[in-house]
Amino acid sequence: MVKRFSFLAALLVASPLFAGVATEKFDWHPVNGVQEIHVESDRVVVSSLEFDMGDRLKPLQASSAKAVARVDNNGFLAYEVGVAIAVFDGDGNIVAAGSGGVKLGSLGKGERDTFTIRFPYVYRSLTNAKTFIVTLETRERGSKSKPKPASQ
């Protein structure tokens, strides 16, 4: 009897997983700026990146360099979506980094959108890129993270 109650209690206490994360590393091989990739979490897929090496914006000393990610929600639920990209040279140094995501609300089931990931300040060696990492983060729309209890 005690085993049944402890199993039931564990089942009730365990919260459902509402968020997902997937990270993949790729070699740098864009063709005309576009590279096909596949990063998937909760049936949400980043399927391509279009890299734009950009220009330096004077007098800000910033760059217009960016990547545009195509994201498809092939699932049955709406998700809040975030995409992060870190680009590395042959020595493992980061030469560009940025993140982007859903502009307003969520990516509905069956929808496709593009997210712009800007590289405004870390961009000067982007031409030396050899590899990059893409992280896709998904969270079911309407799910709330439970706050951690304050320690006393």
Predicted regions and their residues:
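Transition segment at domain starts
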Residues: 20-62, 146-152
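Structural beta-strand segments of beta-rich domains
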Residues: 63-69
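Asparagine-centered strand-capping/turn motif at beta-strand->loop junctions
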Residues: 71-75
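Short, solvent-exposed, Trp/other aromatic-anchored flexible loops in extracytoplasmic proteins
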Residues: 93-130
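Short acidic, flexible loop segments centered on an aromatic residue
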Residues: 76-91
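Terminal connector regions
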Residues: 23-26, 120-152
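N-terminal signal peptide c-region/cleavage motif recognized by signal peptidases
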Residues: 14-16
